[in-house]
């Protein structure tokens, strides 16, 4: 099967297969561990369809009558390894043994913790601990509450307030669309913010999450606009993000009325007080609407605290806030329930620093003040530097002026000075003097000698800060993230600059700055900071390019900062809100929050103490709120409601009597979720959504993605708690039915998981077995007296390539030969010609004389040309050869009488003459031309006569330069090397009876080459060129065969070998009822090396001359097999989840299934694994009278994987054949899939069968609401496809976290499963036809680029798909927003670069999306971060939805690919380096290219059982350890469930370790003393240069393709 992406203009792709890296690295140790217990093949990714693991559960398999009974070949004995390798493996074993305990840590995360507990003990555990409730429960409960009443949400920073706002906006807009469909007046929603910077941020977030027209306004953007402008804005948009003042002015001028607003969202609502615009909007306009029916239904506010400024929480103004906003506060009853999504603070500490010195001025500051101190522009800078010297230190104060008077800023200062003076007076003589003072100040700073930074020149506060940072960034920790909060922008800038000085740099710390969008005059940096700049800084912070940010209050609220583990309050907070919000940034596990307090400063101490007191008071205040203000979740007073509810169901397991009731179902489900595979740092939980429905409450439970069943819905009950239990109960029943809970209600999924995710159903390319091999086709077994014959003409397309006149050869057979594909023959000196095998119409009935003549010609060819004298009758010959009267260029297809084209004269002459009679004295000179002569004593010597030489006699010495004869007499017994002895090759005993005449004529001739394999183009010219010589004819035999017939018959062995191979392949196709094109049939069955199919390895035992092997067809067939089975499973099994779809598909397309089905029909016998053999092409069953005999090999050794690969190649051949039909179709390929998989889940024989078997589900055909119709209309305008069923489109964008009960639609997962395979096929089609000469490895790697998550995520943003996704997870909202910002920045940079380069060679087709159509480099996405998985998922789901909606029209998929994907890949050279971005490949380049090390290995071995773990668990959940070993030391290691991903993980870790390490440090650390040879050094230098192509390439950026063919 196709290899996963192994990670050219760039030579990076050559590292794997062609570069010196591949020659010097022990590839066996990388790809195939040689020690016992190590994996023989790298298993595949989870859900990698070809790498499915057999469950090994014999009971389960026996229960299913359709279960495959796999045949598994025993592994062959391991090949021998060198002593060096053996020592390395032994050392690796010792290392594993010594570190087994450490390696085993964390493995219990993948095993059910409670596996050994009884069910009763689980019950007792549950009684003593509450089930953790997902934060999403509270978010959705708050969302539901906000839909019915005005609400003030009081939630911690990072707990998802913005998500709730987005959900509410979407819900409001969807209701607005329904109202508009009813002809109700238009209304619009407003999202109001307090700060200008937040306008851009919140608009960017909402625009990423709402696929509706949104607009943003603030400040200068709406000055001097008219009423028409606002009317147009309100008509064209569904929502507006703006500062509150903007809306207030619009209401004041009556550009809009309050009854035209359907939603108000107040961001950070605690600002609603006094004359704040929030308060004025409510008091002046909202409250004035007396008719409650005309008021907007919801006025909602978001805040982290109802407390503002320094107000005592005990007298908090929540009643005032509630009354002013006409809303009710809503907060969580148990704040700790949000901790797993919010703050995870470990400790909060106070650090003291020495008292600051009194304010003073440095000498530079005083000198500058004397020059420009009176100028207004310098008043704020001087005010800052007056305090900077004492608070930061004199070095920072002087450094401020050095930065202030940078060269590019001086001109701006002069211009500002002029404007300032002119503003006071139209003309002033002081202008020149003041400008000169500015210039003088610049010269003064330029001439000042600045000292290097040192602790003596820094304040004690800065010194302590540096000490803290050094302690926090000690060692290598790539996950360390720190924010230092300061009060002033200049302080942030100067501290960042200080840490960038060489003397002050802290290893591992990369400083950055995050400040607001204002432009204070005191700042030395006058550049305006945009929201985009802020987001790009945050992205760098997230990626680790920056890990310590100096930030002002802008980082406290609003901006979505990545989770941190160090927060430092350099300047203490002024308000409780600042404290709560800045502390909320410390969300990583084990975070620390540091207050920097001045020694002996009671005010500082009081502030810190007051923080805790105020927070405690606030918490008590929230707890004291009335019950209707609290979000209780779904567990509130569960015991009471369960006792009260009588209508509870119960299930008893018949076999064991175990009972499942409502309360216990929560425990069972929690245990099951905990048993699912997950990273050690992640805690999986089930999500519960309880909605109010007629009659009470109904709950939907959603399980994590790794679960085989994703969701279930319970019954309606009067309480939330019982409704929740009902949903859990329904889910448990489904798990029991699916056998994911055992007879004791314990999870079995962990034990079954390897059966569905690892590589036990894959077969190995290393496991081989002997199989019978068909040498000859069945056609030749039809013997007997011929009554009628059919003919095939063997002609040359370019007969001049032979360099001798020739005529076609007729092959006469008892049955017609199928069409044989043309193929080339190679004649040396760059001469070649295609051979056409042309079936001649009709048949011929011959008399006995004619038959005997054909027998004579056939046997004469065998005897005279090939030195094989057979005794055979016409009944014994499988075919006959005959000369023809027609030429190579003749049209044999128009022959009407077959017997007329046979050269019967030549046939009769051959039949009547065994040899041409030769009279020594009576022959004319013409006799000695154009005859074919054979040596009866030496079968290797054949001659063409050129003519008589009257100037030579037999006793003349053989001239120099004539090729010497090979016979023994010439070398041993001949005393004279004359022409006579040259011509007589008989042995000594025979020579005694021969006395050739010495007066006979001498003839000039050509010695013909004996080479038969004309199929091989890798030959020397000398092997095929005739050599001149001089002979006498008396000891030789002149053949009766015509020379033009002989010239063509010399090619017959190669032709016959290819015909035999083609016929055997076609017989296999006929056996399977597949009418495949002949050349494709042969290609599909051709295996030309021992490791065909291993595209990334050097070929072993390559056999030339076999033509194209199966690899390209296998690449194509693999993808079609995936698509066909995917469509079939999607069609036939509509009620299963995506996970089960993957399982079912794995069972169909896994190599083990193909391998076993192939063996059942003996397909392996037809595989062509042997190149041309000069003794195997002769007919079988004939009696050989004279000539060498060789027993034919009738067996060949094939790897299990080879047989499976041939199955896929045959599917590929069927696909190409079907595409050539009129019209092009898939029918033949679909029949091939059905034959190969042989499964009830794929029984289709034509493409139309797929849709004929599809029954549209009820949700697809249900009536659409206005929201769904609006979405379909917008997508039609954007994408060009009009959906017949808009609900399909809606489903394609519904994330699994979005409750299905909202719109009664399933999530996109089933459609994504379908679209993934469809998009794969479209990509493979494009590459296969666009690059007909590309090898399968290249095709696989570049296909991975096209279908990678990284590209599809970019495409989702490019097409605007991200705005249409419906989800209920704040983490997804955050990820999408960050990724969209990054990808749009990369796109803009690409456009900017294109505008600077008019003749951009990467210009491609304009985008049809909503972005401007222009030319730019389409690889801008390569260097971006990984996208959130939902983005590539919705692209695939959209493709799947279009496919289903169009009644399975694949042309729609091709159109999507051509319009939206192909423009990015017109120049595939852009992605050569990306295609090779595989961790192991890249590590190989680093080790040899940069480190110059040759002694390293990547070793994989089974991890021994963990002490204390049950043996059964170990057997069912195998773990392997992979280590990068360098000179006997472990550089990096990883533990994984499969060898393949262990190697990837270990390589990533090794790359991380080597990042920033130079060759000298590496050699010292690992004792490397490798000395490379001259060629190796040159190759290493080349590799090192190539690695610079991706200078930022690091382990964090490595991506392995998620899709594609299984390995």
Swiss-Prot record:
EC numbers for this chain: 3.1.26.-, 3.6.4.-
Residues flagged as site, Important for activity: 1429
InterPro entries in the record: Dicer_dimer_sf (IPR038248), Dicer_dimerisation_dom (IPR005034), dsRBD_dom (IPR014720), DSRM_2 (IPR056755), Helicase/UvrB_N (IPR006935), Helicase_ATP-bd (IPR014001), Helicase_C-like (IPR001650), P-loop_NTPase (IPR027417)
Gene Ontology biological process: defense response to virus; regulation of defense response to virus; siRNA processing
Pfam families assigned: Dicer_dimer, DSRM_2, Helicase_C, ResIII, Ribonuclease_3
Cofactor(s) named in the record: Mg(2+); Mn(2+)
Region ranges (Disordered): 1-74
Record-annotated Dicer dsRNA-binding fold domain positions: 665-755
Residues covered by the DRBM domain: 1478-1556
Binding site for Mg(2+): 1312, 1433, 1436
Domain RNase III: 1063-1219, 1272-1447
Helicase C-terminal domain mapped to chain residues: 461-632
Cross-referenced SMART domains: DEXDc, HELICc, RIBOc
Family: Belongs to the helicase family. Dicer subfamily.
Protein name: Dicer-like protein 1
């Amino acid at each position: 099967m196709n290899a996963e992406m192994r990670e050219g203009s760039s030579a990076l792709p050559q590292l794997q297969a062609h570069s010196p890296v591949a020659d010097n690295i022990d590839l066996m140790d990388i790809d195939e561990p040689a020690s016992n217990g190590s994996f023989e093949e790298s298993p595949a990714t989870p859900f990698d369809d070809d790498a499915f693991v057999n469950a090994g559960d014999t009971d389960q398999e026996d229960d299913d009558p359709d279960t495959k009974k796999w045949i598994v070949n025993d592994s062959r004995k391991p090949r021998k390894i060198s002593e060096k390798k053996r020592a390395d493996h032994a050392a690796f074993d010792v290392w594993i043994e010594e570190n087994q305990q450490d390696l085993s840590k964390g493995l219990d995360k993948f095993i059910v913790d409670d596996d050994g507990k009884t069910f009763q003990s689980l019950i007792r555990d549950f009684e003593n601990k509450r089930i953790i409730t997902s934060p999403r429960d509270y978010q959705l409960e708050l969302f539901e509450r906000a839909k019915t009443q005005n609400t003030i949400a009081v939630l911690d920073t990072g707990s998802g307030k913005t998500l709730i706002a987005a959900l509410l906006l979407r819900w409001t807009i969807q209701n607005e669309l329904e109202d508009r469909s009813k002809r109700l007046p238009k209304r619009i929603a407003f999202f109001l913010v307090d700060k200008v910077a937040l306008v851009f941020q919140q608009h960017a977030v909402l625009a990423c999450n709402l696929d509706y027209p949104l607009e943003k306004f603030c400040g200068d953007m709406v000055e001097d606009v008219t009423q028409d402008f606002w009317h147009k804005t309100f008509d064209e948009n569904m929502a507006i993000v703006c500062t509150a003042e903007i809306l207030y002015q619009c209401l004041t001028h009556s550009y809009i009325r309050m009854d035209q607003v359907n939603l108000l969202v107040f961001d950070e609502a605690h600002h609603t007080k006094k004359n704040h615009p929030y308060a004025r909007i409510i008091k002046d306009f909202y409250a004035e609407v007396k008719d409650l029916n005309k008021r907007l239904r919801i006025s909602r506010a978001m805040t982290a605290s109802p407390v503002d400024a320094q107000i005592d929480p005990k007298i908090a103004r929540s009643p005032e806030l509630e009354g002013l906003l006409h809303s009710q506060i809503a907060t969580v009853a148990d704040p700790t329930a949000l901790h797993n999504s919010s703050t995870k603070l470990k400790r909060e500490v106070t650090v003291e620093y020495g008292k600051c010195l009194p304010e003073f001025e440095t000498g530079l500051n005083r000198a500058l003040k004397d020059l420009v101190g009176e100028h207004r522009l310098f008043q704020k800078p001087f005010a800052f530097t007056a305090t900077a010297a004492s608070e930061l230190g004199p070095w920072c104060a002087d450094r401020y002026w050095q930065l202030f008077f940078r060269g590019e800023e001086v001109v701006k200062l002069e211009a500002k000075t002029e404007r300032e003076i002119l503003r006071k007076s139209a003309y002033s003589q002081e202008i020149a003097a003041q400008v000169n003072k500015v210039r003088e100040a610049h010269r003064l700073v330029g001439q000042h000698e600045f000292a290097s930074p040192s602790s003596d020149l820094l304040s004690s506060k800065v010194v302590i800060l540096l000490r803290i940072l050094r302690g926090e960034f000690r060692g290598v920790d790539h996950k360390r993230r720190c924010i230092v909060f300061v009060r002033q922008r200049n302080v942030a800038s100067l501290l960042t600059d200080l840490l960038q000085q060489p003397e002050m740099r802290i290893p591992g710390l990369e400083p950055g700055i995050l400040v607001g969008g204002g432009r204070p005059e005191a700042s030395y940096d006058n550049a305006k900071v945009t929201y985009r700049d802020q987001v790009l800084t945050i992205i760098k912070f997230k990626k680790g390019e920056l890990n310590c940010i100096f930030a002002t209050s802008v980082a406290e609220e609003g901006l979505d900062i990545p989770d941190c583990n160090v927060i430092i309050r350099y300047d203490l907070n002024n308000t409780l809100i600042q404290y709560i919000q800045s502390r909320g940034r410390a969300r990583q596990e084990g975070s620390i929050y540091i207050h920097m307090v001045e020694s002996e400063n009671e005010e500082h101490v009081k502030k810190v103490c007051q923080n805790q007191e105020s927070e405690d008071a606030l918490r008590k205040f929230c707890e004291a709120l009335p019950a209707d203000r609290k979000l209780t979740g779904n567990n509130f007073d569960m015991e009471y409601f369960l006792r009260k509810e009588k209508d509870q169901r119960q299930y008893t397991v018949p076999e064991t009597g175990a009972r499942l009731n409502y309360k216990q179902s929560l425990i069972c489900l929690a245990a099951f979720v905990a048993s699912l595979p997950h990273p050690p740092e992640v805690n999986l939980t089930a999500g519960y959504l309880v909605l109010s429905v007629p009659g009470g409450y109904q709950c939907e439970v959603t399980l994590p993605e790794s679960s085989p069943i994703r969701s279930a819905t319970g019954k309606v009950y009067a309480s939330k708690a019982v409704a929740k239990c009902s949903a859990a109960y329904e889910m448990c029943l489904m798990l029991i039915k699916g056998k994911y809970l055992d007879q004791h209600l314990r999870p079995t999924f962990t034990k079954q998981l390897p059966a569905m995710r690892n590589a036990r159903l894959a077969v190995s390319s290393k496991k081989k077995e002997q199989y019978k091999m068909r040498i000859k086709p069945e056609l030749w077994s039809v013997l007997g007296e011929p009554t009628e014959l059919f003919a095939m003409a063997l002609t040359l397309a370019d007969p001049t390539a032979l360099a001798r006149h020739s005529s076609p050869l007729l092959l006469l057979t008892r049955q017609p030969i199928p069409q044989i594909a043309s193929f080339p023959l190679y004649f040396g000196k760059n001469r070649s010609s295609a051979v056409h095998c042309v079936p001649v119409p009709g048949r011929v009935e011959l008399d006995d004389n004619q038959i005997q003549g054909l027998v004579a010609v056939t046997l004469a060819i065998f005897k005279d040309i090939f030195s094989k004298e057979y005794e055979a009758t016409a009944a014994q010959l499988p075919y006959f050869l005959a000369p023809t009267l027609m030429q190579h260029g003749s049209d044999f297809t128009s022959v009407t009488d077959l017997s007329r084209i046979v050269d019967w004269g030549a046939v009769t002459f051959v039949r009547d003459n065994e040899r041409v009679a030769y009279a020594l004295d009576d022959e004319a000179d013409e006799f000695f031309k154009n005859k074919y002569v054979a040596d009866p004593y030496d079968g290797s010597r054949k001659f063409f006569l050129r003519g008589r030489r009257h100037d030579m006699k037999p006793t003349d010495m053989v001239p120099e330069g004539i090729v010497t004869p090979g016979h023994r007499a010439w070398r041993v017994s001949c005393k004279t090397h004359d022409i006579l002895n040259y011509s007589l090759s008989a042995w000594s005993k025979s020579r005694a009876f021969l006395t050739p005449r010495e007066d006979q004529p001498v003839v000039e001739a050509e010695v013909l080459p004996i080479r038969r394999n004309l199929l091989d183009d890798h030959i020397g010219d000398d092997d095929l060129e005739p050599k001149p010589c001089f002979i006498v004819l008396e000891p030789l035999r002149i053949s009766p065969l015509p020379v033009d017939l002989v010239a063509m018959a010399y090619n017959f062995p190669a032709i016959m070998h290819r015909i035999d191979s083609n016929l055997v392949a076609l017989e296999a196709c006929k056996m399977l009822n597949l009418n495949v094109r002949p050349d494709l049939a042969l290609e599909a069955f051709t295996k030309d090396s021992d490791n065909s199919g291993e595209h990334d390895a050097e070929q072993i035992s390559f056999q030339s001359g076999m033509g194209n092997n199966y690899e390209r067809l296998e690449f194509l067939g693999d993808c079609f097999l995936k698509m066909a089975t995917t469509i079939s499973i999607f069609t036939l099994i509509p009620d299963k989840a995506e996970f089960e779809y993957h399982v079912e598909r794995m069972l169909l397309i896994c190599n083990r299934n193909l391998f076993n089905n192939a063996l059942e029909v003996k397909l392996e016998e037809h595989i062509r694994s042997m190149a041309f053999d000069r003794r195997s092409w002769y007919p079988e069953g004939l009696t050989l009278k004279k000539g060498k005999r060789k027993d034919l090999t009738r067996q060949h050794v094939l790897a299990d994987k080879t047989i499976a690969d041939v199955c896929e190649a045959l599917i590929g051949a069927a696909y190409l054949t079907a595409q050539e039909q009129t019209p092009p179709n898939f029918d033949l390929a679909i029949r091939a899939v059905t034959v190969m998989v042989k499964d009830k889940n794929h029984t289709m024989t034509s493409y139309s069968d797929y849709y004929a078997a599809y029954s549209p589900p009820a949700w697809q055909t249900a009536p659409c609401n206005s929201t769904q119709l609006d979405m379909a209309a917008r997508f039609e305008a954007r994408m060009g496809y009009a959906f017949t069923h808009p609900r399909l489109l809606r489903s394609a964008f519904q994330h699994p976290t979005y409750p299905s009960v909202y719109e009664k639609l399933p999530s996109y997962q089933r459609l994504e499963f379908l679209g993934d395979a469809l998009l794969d096929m479209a990509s493979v089609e494009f590459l296969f036809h666009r690059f007909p000469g590309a090898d399968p490895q290249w095709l696989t790697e570049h296909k991975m680029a096209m279908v990678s998550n990284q590209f599809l995520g970019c495409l989702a943003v490019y097409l605007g798909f991200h705005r249409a996704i419906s989800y209920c997870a704040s983490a997804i909202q955050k990820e999408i927003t960050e990724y969209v910002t990054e990808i749009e920045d990369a796109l803009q940079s690409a456009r900017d670069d294109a505008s600077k380069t008019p003749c951009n060679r990467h210009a491609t087709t304009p985008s049809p999306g909503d972005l401007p159509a222009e030319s730019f480099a389409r690889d801008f996405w390569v260097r971006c971060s990984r996208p959130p998985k939902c983005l590539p998922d919705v692209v695939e789901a959209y493709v799947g939805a279009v496919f289903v909606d169009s009644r399975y029209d694949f042309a729609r998929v091709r159109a999507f690919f051509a319009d939206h994907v192909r423009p990015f890949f017109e120049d595939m050279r852009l992605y050569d380096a990306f295609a090779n971005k595989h961790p192991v490949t890249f590590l190989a380049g680093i080790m040899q290219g940069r480190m110059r090390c040759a002694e390293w290995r990547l070793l994989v071995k089974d991890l021994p059982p963990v002490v204390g773990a049950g043996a059964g668990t170990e057997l069912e959940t195998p773990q392997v350890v992979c280590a990068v070993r360098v000179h006997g030391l472990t550089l990096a290691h990883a533990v994984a469930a499969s060898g393949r991903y262990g190697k990837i993980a270990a390589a990533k870790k090794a790359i991380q370790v080597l990042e920033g390490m130079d060759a000298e440090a590496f050699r010292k650390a690992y004792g490397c003393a490798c000395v490379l040879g001259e060629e190796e050094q040159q190759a290493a230098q080349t590799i090192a240069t190539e690695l610079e192509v991706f200078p930022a390439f690091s382990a964090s950026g490595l991506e392995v393709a998620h899709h594609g063919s299984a390995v």
